[in-house]
Amino acid sequence: VSANVAPIEGEFDYIIVGAGSAGCVLANRLSANPANRVLLLEAGGNDNWIWFHIPVGYLFAIGNPRADWLLKTEAEPGLNGRSLNYPRGKVVGGSSAINGMIYMLGQAADYDNWRQLGLPGWSWEDVRPYFRKHVDHFLKSEHHGAGGEWRVEYPRLSWEILDAFRQAANEYGIPTVDDFNTGDNEGICYFHVNQKRGRRWSAARGFLKPVMHRQNLQLATGCLVEGLELTVRRVTGVRWRQNGEQRAARSRGEVILAAGSIGSPHILMLSGIGPSAQLSKFSIPVALDRPGVGSNLHDHLQLRMIYKVSGVKTLNETYASVFNRVGMGLNYAFRRRGPMTMAPSQLGAFTRSDSTQDRANIQYHVQPLSLDKFGEPLHPFPAFTASVTNIRPTSRGALALKSADPAMAPAISPNYLATPEDQQVAADSIRVTRSIVRQPA
């Protein structure tokens, strides 16, 4: 990892830990006021590798220490003791540099529920203006803005096999829609993607790079945060290791943790903020006993089903030909089109796992390809994959310290399929998949 080790002098108004999807936006917005001095810390390096910008580059980034934290879950009881890879971006841009590029807002009811739980200012109508402000969307409608930093485009290719699945979903009762981001995402359509003219449009490219000329904004890369500095239960600074040296910075305003659902609680616990029993186990002085730190982890498990097909093209047999692969490369190089612009999933759908659900509770990711697992070769036969996930699981996981060493990842336990409700939705969602593919289309 290359590191930006420019001198860090004086105090900052804001120190942001993590230059990922949230950190890049925060750095942009906070440094817009020239009176604010902002420091942005990132554990990874700069996004100057070509595969961070070619859409299919996630194939080379996930599982690569140049781009990925290489996290794994603990053995999952609900998955017969299997441990899963848990990709998280370790680069300027964070996971937006290696993810599926799908632009997806939540359901209006989800945001309204936050307000009902006691979060004023977080209802659907409250957050919509901010979504509109930051986006530059190809759809010109009341739901989307134009001219913002976050570019959203329609995918640059379609597949007959995916169109057939969409028709089958229509016959099952799932309507075709134009946009998942209107507040009610029930329906089926091609996913809209964070790309600009055929290139991945990460948070770094959209929000950070255009403002790096600001004299009041400083980015430091290769910074493994070791903990927060506290003064009488107030966070006043950050300490980190960079190029083998310990460094620190102080904040006269705020320290903002934007290190993600794993990194942020991990840093809190390393700093003595968390469950006292865990902290004491690793001889970390307890600054604030907070049992909730590291608990209540929500995650979505995808259930994949693969179907062999005939008489229709899929990526499996297309990619098998060397001639075709050369053509894909040339098509992308000269036209920014073709399979190299593909997101991991192209066609999406939201529907209900059974008739008792009051709104869509499962989501589909449909791909014109198949393989045994990520990173392995495509199958030698034509096939497509339909993955389905419960978007409101009731199972709750947790993470726990394994060591006081900041370089050692915490124990991650998503606790998939731990509740009868999630087990029922999983079974019902597979039945829905089978019902769709049995349609005449």
Identify the meaning behind each predicted range.
Residues 24, 198, 356:
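Aromatic-residue-lined binding/catalytic grooves and analogous aromatic/hydrophobic interfacial grooves
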Residues 1-12, 128, 134-182, 189-191, ...:
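FAD-dependent oxidoreductase catalytic-site/capping-region signature
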Residues 2-132, 289-292, 300-309:
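N-terminal glycine-rich phosphate/pyrophosphate-binding loop and immediately adjacent elements
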Residues 33, 37, 44-49, 228-233, ...:
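Glycine-rich loop(s) and the adjacent beta-strand/alpha-helix scaffold that form part
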Residues 115-235, 304-328:
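Conserved redox-cofactor binding core of oxidoreductases
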Residues 27-31, 111-115, 128-132, 163-170, ...:
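Non-transmembrane alpha-helical segments in soluble domains
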